[in-house]
UniProtKB/Swiss-Prot annotation:
Function (record text): F(1)F(0) ATP synthase produces ATP from ADP in the presence of a proton or sodium gradient. F-type ATPases consist of two structural domains, F(1) containing the extramembraneous catalytic core and F(0) containing the membrane proton channel, linked together by a central stalk and a peripheral stalk. During catalysis, ATP synthesis in the catalytic domain of F(1) is coupled via a rotary mechanism of the central stalk subunits to proton translocation.
Location within or outside the cell: Cell inner membrane
Protein name, UniProt field: ATP synthase subunit delta
Keywords from the UniProt entry: ATP synthesis, Cell inner membrane, Cell membrane, CF(1), Hydrogen ion transport, Ion transport, Membrane, Transport
InterPro entries the UniProt entry points to: ATP_synth_OSCP/delta_N_sf (IPR026015), ATPase_OSCP/d_CS (IPR020781), ATPase_OSCP/dsu (IPR000711)
Similarity annotation: Belongs to the ATPase delta chain family.
GO MF annotation list: proton-transporting ATP synthase activity, rotational mechanism
Lineage: Bacteria, Pseudomonadati, Pseudomonadota, Gammaproteobacteria, Thiotrichales
Disulfide feature: none
SUPFAM superfamilies: N-terminal domain of the delta subunit of the F1F0-ATP synthase
Length: 174
């Protein structure tokens, strides 16, 4: 976990707990994504990180447009001078929400694009293996030669040709 992730996690967790408790998950998810996109804009990031304007002043300017609770959340982040990590807070909020909804992300790396039926079959197999709904993110990397590398959380399933060749190489060299 990166330093930014460690800093963002308590904010994301607090936001999730509040939003979940008050049935506001969708609303807060959208608000966090919106502010995340705003902060990613270079001109907004420049204003937020400006030494002449405090982050609290930036958030105060938005007070009338925001729900009181979300404003208070942003004010806390601004008070701690952490507005620039808003994209990470939003990402972690979404990760916590997926875990809460029993959804896990599977990063699937393939050597080349493949048939939808094969991907559906892989998704079904992963859902059975992990006992949850799988949200697959497909990446193409010709370097794996063939097969697939699947990462779900801390679990890595390497059934790629390059992975098998590496294992064979290490066996032969030992």
């Amino acid at each position: 976990m990166t330093n930014i992730s460690v800093i963002a996690k308590p904010y994301a967790k607090a936001a999730f707990e509040f939003a979940n408790e008050h049935n506001l998950l969708q609303q807060w998810s959208k608000l966090l994504q919106t502010f995340s996109e705003l902060i990613k804009d270079k001109s907004v990031a420049a204003i937020v990180s400006s030494p002449t304007i405090s982050q609290i002043e930036v958030v105060d300017a938005l007070k009338k447009q925001l729900d009181e609770n979300f404003f208070n959340f942003l004010a806390l982040i601004a008070e701690n001078k952490k507005m620039l990590i808003m994209p990470e807070i939003a990402d972690q909020f979404e990760s916590i929400k997926k875990i809460h909804n029993n959804v896990r992300v599977a990063d699937v790396t393939l050597a080349y694009a493949t048939d939808k039926n094969i991907l559906d079959s892989l998704k079904t197999s992963l859902e059975k293996k992990f006992g949850c709904t799988i949200d697959m993110h497909i990446n193409i990397d010709p370097a794996i030669i063939g097969g697939a590398v699947v990462k779900v959380g801390d679990t890595v399933i390497d059934s790629s040709v390059s992975g098998h060749l590496e294992k064979l190489k290490s066996i032969l060299l030992s």
